[in-house]
Amino acid sequence: MAVAVPPGRAAGSGWAWRPVARDALLARAFHSCTELRGRFYLVGGLLAGGAREPSSDTVVFDPARGQAVRLGARGSPPRSHHDAAPVDGRWLCVVGGWDGSRRLATVTALDTERGVWEAWTGTPGDCPPAGLSSHTCTRISDRELQVAGREGGIHTQRRYGSIYTLRLDPSARTYCYKQEGCHTASRSGHCAALLQTPGPHPGHQLLLFGGCNLAEPEVAGHWSHGKIKEEPPVAPHLMEQLARLVSSGQGSQKGPHGLRHHSCSVVGPFAVLFGGETLTRARDTICNDLYIYDTRTSPPLWFHFPCADRGMKRMGHRTCLWNDQLYLVGGFGEDGRTASPQVCILDFI
């Protein structure tokens, strides 16, 4: 178990990744991992570092039983560096990514009731990105996603990031991209967090972290009170534990500099980031640090909790929130080539 207790701190102010399952089916990186009806759906990814061809399989992990099975649904798309989101509690929509030959902006959906993959089609008014990989898709309603990332094909990449609203219609099996009027910094391998804004004028904002040589988060969208209908998972115990951990640390207004291919999960007022690859070093680039972005204060504060266990270095992994626990799934380890078959939960000591 990877344990990290800050020097001079007592028990109760440390954290650990505690292994709860291990299966070779889960060993992958740059995959998507999406919770839907109490199951984690892992789609695609790279099975080894340096691989050019992404996996085309879908693995379902049952966190209650600690068991993984390969889904037999036909038509599972080969994808890596994509993102995915649940829709209407039934469909798993995979957006963009690398298929082994090009970057895509298409939507492919798994009907979890019928066990069938479907290629959805763009509507006549659709204005899709040129191509997406290492982007983010954030639910802002049950049928709307906010897509953020750098567009481009194999040979050309934009010098800025684009923001799209992606509307999904499961009954018609269609989707429609609408480009928003603003741009962001050129980011790839970043993460996104939809967080409530405190203060006298509450609302929501979408923040982008990392994916470029910057430390500051960037606002990619802002909604006034009542506009966002998306209800985040309730995790009161985990939120309490994170608050206790933060109270043992020293906050800073500066976040991690030049981090990419890390994970991010929103737990109440906290964005919890882990691992990733740093752009600030030529060697030993894969990280095992825990960062917590606390929005309860104004301005929000960063808290950094290092980990001494090099075996927990990860990049291209995912974290997933379920049943008041934060799960860590997959990713390449310290060598940047070997995918982890472990599932861990964030524990506190």
Curated annotation (Swiss-Prot):
Pfam families given for it? Answer: Kelch_KLHDC2_KLHL20_DRC7 (PF24681)
Q: Which domain of life is it from?
A: Eukaryota
Q: Which keywords has UniProt assigned to this entry?
A: Kelch repeat, Repeat
Q: Where are the Kelch repeats?
A: 39-89, 91-137, 325-349
Can you name one GO molecular function term for this protein?
cyclin binding
Keyword Nucleotide-binding appears in the UniProt entry: no
Outline the subunit composition: Interacts with CCNA1.
Q: What is the protein named? A: Kelch domain-containing protein 9
Which species does this protein come from?
A: Homo sapiens (Human)
* Organism placement in taxonomy: Eukaryota, Metazoa, Chordata, Craniata, Vertebrata
